[in-house]
Design a protein with these regions (language model features):
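N-terminal amphipathic/basic-hydrophobic helices that include classical n-h-c signal peptides
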Residues: 1-24
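Flavin-dependent oxidoreductase catalytic cores
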Residues: 19-425
Length: 425
């Protein structure tokens, strides 16, 4: 009798949970409805997330890069994000990457014009790669909170001085001004993946004993300072562009930043008032990139993208660097809901958003926007097809989560299954 009563209570609780979920979904905004992002109004709530592009061999905008972003814009996204626009030459991830300088503005203007012609907005992801930067190909010493070895670049990053930190903040402000001049609608400040700001946030990497190390409040000074430097620059220009940030919820590394510390950081960023939205991400480009990507770990293919001896080292240690995490739809939602419950500002859900069901779920959970990457790499027109399908839920992504696209990030990023975006023209 007792067991029957408990079973009945369990069924009632499950039914109540389903009813609440259905009620939320019924009252949630339509992902295809227009939405405000700071001063912008996007035509829908779907953003193409920033990804490696490898389409700038001379560190300047090419027709290839323009087409790479024009395709998802024509394919229906509300906004596409150009990555990675470093704030300085030494802040690039590798030597062919674009950095924000006057010579880059005309090319960026051609890009933003092309995106606007398709009815979409366009954001520039700006940041300093810090210890992730390839000092050899950049021909500039990388920076980190402390002297730190980059296993990919096979070089040490030097400890950033106070003058270095001031310079990086000034570079972010200048990058924002150049983005405005180039016609961008938004800038996204990279605070994740153990790039410079994220490295300062990480207790594993940041072992400083000065005002930028030790307590979380000290470790967060660089991230908060960068955001406010950009905000002041944007406000001074009187520009109506949005300012967002990409923030790690967790590094996925023992000793790295966790959700509790990251949530506290997010609250500070919210209270500072410099951001119009935060895109929630995870993982470390230095130690554990698959914590962000999930799915198959393409060790053989990724190793093949490097020259010996790094190729051999990657093959021998690849299982440790490219750890395999099972894929599931909306795989960052569990952690993201912790942030949604505590923050009032707009949040962007990333990770495993591949179909209408996951988009609707994100809206029901209170997220203002969703961000997609691999699914749009595989099918740049996916959003238009989902929109045409309506609420039938009959359109699913061609992305298989094989992650072999990761092996192409240094040689024109593309989907090796569909051939897109090259074969989507």
């Amino acid at each position: 009798m007792m067991a029957t009563r408990f079973a009945r209570q369990g069924h009632q609780a499950a039914a109540l949970a389903i009813a609440i979920k259905l009620s939320r979904m019924a009252t949630a905004p339509d992902v295809f409805s227009p939405a405000k992002l700071g001063p912008l109004t996007l035509r829908n709530r779907i953003i193409k997330a920033a990804t490696f592009e490898a389409r700038t061999p001379d560190a300047l905008v090419t027709d290839d890069l323009i087409e790479y972003h024009r395709l998802p814009a024509a394919g229906g996204v509300g906004m596409t994000t150009v990555a990675y626009c470093a704030v300085s030459q030494g802040g690039r991830t590798e030597g062919n990457g674009i950095w924000m300088r006057p010579e880059a503005v005309p090319g960026f203007r051609r890009l933003t014009d092309a995106i606007h012609a398709e009815g979409a907005a366009v954001s520039a992801q700006i940041g300093h790669a810090g210890p992730v930067a390839n000092a050899k190909t950049n021909k500039a010493t990388a920076l980190a909170p402390v002297r730190f070895f980059n296993p990919i670049g096979m070089r040490f990053a030097r400890k950033a001085t106070r003058e270095d930190i001031d310079d990086v903040m000034a570079d972010h402000a200048n990058a924002a001004r150049l983005a405005i001049e180039a016609g961008f609608d938004a800038v996204e400040i990279h605070l994740g993946h153990n790039y410079l700001a994220s490295a300062f946030l990480s207790p594993l990497i940041n072992r400083r004993d000065d005002e930028f190390g030790g307590s979380l409040e000290n470790r967060a000074k660089v991230a908060r300072g960068l955001v406010m430097a950009v905000r002041r620059a944007v406000d001074k220009e009187g520009a109506r562009i949005a300012v967002t940030a990409k923030l790690n919820m967790a590094d996925g590394v023992r000793g790295g930043i966790n959700t509790e510390e990251s949530l506290t950081t997010a609250k500070w960023l919210q209270d500072d008032g410099g951001l119009d939205a935060i895109e929630l991400t995870a993982g470390s480009s230095l130690v554990n990139p698959m914590y962000l990507f999930r799915g198959d770990a393409p060790i053989k293919e990724f190793a093949g993208a490097f020259k010996p001896p790094l190729r051999w080292g990657m093959r021998m240690t690849g299982k440790k660097f490219l750890r395999e995490y099972p894929y599931r739809d909306a795989y960052l939602l569990r952690d993201a809901k912790l942030f949604r419950a505590e923050l009032t500002m707009p949040l962007i859900l990333l990770g495993g958003i591949t179909n209408r069901e996951t988009m609707d779920l994100a809206m029901a959970e209170g997220f203002h926007f969703v961000a997609m990457a691999r699914a749009l790499l595989a099918e740049p027109d996916l959003i238009n097809r989902i929109a045409a399908d309506g609420a039938q839920h009959g359109v699913h992504s061609a992305c298989t989560h094989c992650n072999r696209c990761l092996a192409t990030i240094y040689s024109r990023t593309r989907c090796v299954v569909t051939g897109a975006p090259d074969e989507a023209r």
